[in-house]
């Protein structure tokens, strides 16, 4: 609808047209400030130009049937859509059902490589991981809905010092809790009940002869064993959020290609040796300083593994590569992009989205940390507490790059203070009316819209605006727009519901048709957010 209006206006006016929503709904459904832009070109007052353009648009053959009114107001041109125009789009939308708002794959479709979560398999997923996980999953859903091809990948950091530290931590826990030895723990190690659980499970699963080997062999085996267990648990945690990856990429396997990558970096004159270390000349490409890739002890840095991984990704020639990282990784962006330039790739294809911190409260007090994980709040604990759908909604309700803090008890309330409940309640009200109505769904769908007032038309317009919201959410990586849209549409519906009788009136079928459109838009919006909308819910407010 928005796209059609924009394209027709641009054809008539032979200029790019920006379409906005008026702040006051009494001014119509759409508005454009184009007169202000043209005023400089034609050296006329925006008010005069707006009047001229409003007349031109309203009388043009291509807009007949589109608008009830086209009015110039303080330099803006305001448009009120006709009921016939709205009904045409309503009928089409209701026929499309779950495909309403979607696009077919076309020449403009993108091939997107989306990497997210990628938490080290050294412990259970905590609530900080959940934000990027939920965002990435919904972004992929929206991208596919819009006709793009998406590969979702989890990069498994299954080698290096962190994995060895995991094995060491399990070995020390084994000695303390299984062998009952006195143990001195290092300053840095993995702690929490999950480490003890792994140690005890290793005692039952692994051959007793292993624990008679030298310590390095034991740590190596326990590192691999614990890593595999944690990865299984991570997959279970993600499954509880409704998240499934197309691919799990092993750093250990990918890093086998390091020699070829380093050879290409050498050819590009990207490396040098200093202080017995190998450095990347990343400062040549907007990085703050050069970065170490190989340390004095000949071990590789985390960045070296990241470079090899990105080389593997870029060899696959996707249109766009999106990484979702924690905000604490912001310093890595410049150095990774520098390596891509040295390797001959277009670094602009890489977009890194940063997920800010999450603060969880319960009754206005900090949420209790998990004993099992030490000083973290586990995803599993929060999902068990409030459910996957509430967690997904609240995590998507603010921009990814802004701090998020919320009280989980708000999401347990059955009143308008709980946004997800209020949206479910709107859909529940609609389905209850449809059940009570003597009319079949087919009768309602075939009913022409002829007698709607301004408020009813605006509710219908809001429900039909979903496609534009979906596109904007994807293009701006602003998935909070979907949450805001669903909340606003639900609120408008509740106002409509409370304003007067819907059943047993002369225009009941018309009003129920609006309700069907609202339900469809709420259902499709929630589906893209990874939430199943409810059709039955009790009200206590």
Curated annotation (Swiss-Prot):
Main location: cytoplasm
Family matches, as SUPFAM superfamilies: Anticodon-binding domain of a subclass of class I aminoacyl-tRNA synthetases (SSF47323), Arginyl-tRNA synthetase (ArgRS), N-terminal 'additional' domain (SSF55190), Nucleotidylyl transferase (SSF52374)
Enzyme Commission designation: 6.1.1.19
Pfam families: Arg_tRNA_synt_N, DALR_1, tRNA-synt_1d
Transmembrane segments: none
Motif residue range(s): 'HIGH' region: 119-129
GO cellular component: cytoplasm
Name this protein carries in UniProt: Arginine--tRNA ligase
